[in-house]
C-alpha cells in the first residue's frame, strides 16, 4: 500500500541523511532488493529497509549475508510473518538490530540482537509519536516518527 511505502521511504531517507552527514560506510537499501540470509540459497528475503555496513556483501545481484539492521513496516498481510518467522530468520542470520513498525498499533518494536545471534536480546517498544534511537549507532541517530507520521497521509 502507499502508506507502507511512504513510511519505509521516509525511514530510509532519515538513515541515509545521518550516514551521509557522518561520512559513514553503511548503505541503505529498500525492497525489492534480495537478501540471501544463508548459504543454502533457500532463505531469500526482501526487507522493507535495511542497512549493510560491509559492502563486500553486495554482489550486485543481491546482498549475500545478514544486513546490520532490518526494518519491516507491517501491513495486514505481512504482520504475522514480521513478528514470527522473519524475527527467527534474522536472529539466526546474525542481524544486529530489527525494527518492526506496527502502523496499526502506532508502535515501533525494536529488537537489539547484538552481535551474539540474539543471546542477549533486548526488546524496546516506542510510540510513533517521537524519536526512536538507532542502536547500531549507539542512539546518536534517531528516527523522528512524529515527523514521518505527520508527513504521511492516511495513517
What positions do the PLM features span?
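C-terminal interaction segment
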Residues: 5, 9, 13-18, 27, ...
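N-terminal, charged amphipathic alpha-helical interaction modules
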Residues: 1-2
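A glycine-rich, hydrophobic loop/mini-helix early in the fold
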Residues: 23-25
Amino acid at each position: 500500500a502507499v502508506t507502507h511505502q511512504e513510511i519505509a521511504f521516509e525511514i530510509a531517507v532519515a538513515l541515509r541523511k545521518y550516514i551521509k552527514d557522518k561520512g559513514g560506510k553503511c548503505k541503505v537499501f529498500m525492497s525489492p532488493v534480495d537478501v540471501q540470509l544463508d548459504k543454502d540459497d533457500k532463505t531469500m528475503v526482501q526487507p522493507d529497509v535495511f542497512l549493510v555496513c560491509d559492502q563486500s556483501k553486495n554482489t550486485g545481484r543481491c546482498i549475500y549475508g545478514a544486513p546490520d539492521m532490518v526494518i519491516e513496516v507491517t501491513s495486514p498481510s505481512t504482520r504475522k510473518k514480521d513478528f514470527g518467522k522473519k524475527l527467527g530468520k534474522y536472529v539466526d542470520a546474525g542481524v544486529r538490530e530489527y525494527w518492526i513498525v506496527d502502523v496499526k498499533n502506532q508502535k515501533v518494536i525494536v529488537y537489539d540482537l547484538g552481535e551474539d545471534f540474539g543471546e542477549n536480546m533486548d526488546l524496546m517498544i516506542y510510540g510513533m509519536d517521537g524519536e526512536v534511537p538507532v542502536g547500531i549507532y549507539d542512539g546518536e541517530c534517531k528516527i523522528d516518527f512524529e515527523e514521518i507520521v505527520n508527513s504521511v497521509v492516511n495513517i
